[in-house]
């Protein structure tokens, strides 16, 4: 039903999608899994299931992004810092295919999230729609206990969301960074592969992600310095406690 632990994670991400600079950081991370009738927390994220059927379920989708100082980002030198952001909203999950033993499935994920800055007076910075296909494979052939996740999808943001990252107000324009007003709409594609395994005393997981901004409504922004890039992360978590009750997890 639940597991509790702690660990460490290392990440390598661009400062924002389209940045040509990488932000590498190591963080202590809590490890918590729970599978109740309503609330669930695991390698798929934190979510609450409001509606659940054999093929369709409705849950809560959450996302976080770290802050970025303009002193460290050449493209944004002299511009306001990028605050950490928090996103929350509903997500519909549609199971398109599932193996008889429920160890493999293909789902269509449809999250729509409102985004806010994380500061003393949070700002509404629009919304993000990120439909994607998710293939999960439990117990890889020849690798018992290892789980593989594959995701592929597109990203859309409204005008306020895209402007937060890609607009350049006239007062911040320079000879090499002209003023620019970002529009809402298509914001590129995203592909992710993740692998994980739960050992008796610890959990190990890693992922790699590829983003491509070609064709995005803001691709001509002077703040878009790189239209495609890779990001990656690795996490090791030690399990410190677990419930005596065990439940079957199908998703």
Describe each region flagged by the PLM.
Residues 1-3, 17-18, 37-56, 97-106, ...:
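Short loop/turn motifs that connect adjacent beta-strands in outer-membrane beta-barrel proteins
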Residues 94, 120-203, 211-216:
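Outer-membrane beta-barrel transmembrane domain signature
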Residues 8-12, 30-34, 45-50, 88-96, ...:
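Residues on the lipid-exposed face of transmembrane beta-strands in outer-membrane beta-barrel proteins
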Residues 191-251:
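Predominantly the C-terminal beta-signal and adjacent terminal strand-loop region
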Residues 2, 22-28, 54-56, 82-88, ...:
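Residues that define the transmembrane beta-barrel architecture of outer-membrane proteins
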Residues 14-16, 46, 75-79, 115-122, ...:
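Extracellular loop and loop/strand-boundary signature of outer-membrane beta-barrel proteins
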Residues 2-6, 28, 39-41, 56-60, ...:
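Transmembrane beta-strands of outer-membrane beta-barrel proteins
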Residues 11-17, 65-71, 95-99, 113-120, ...:
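Sequence/structural signature of outer-membrane beta-barrel proteins
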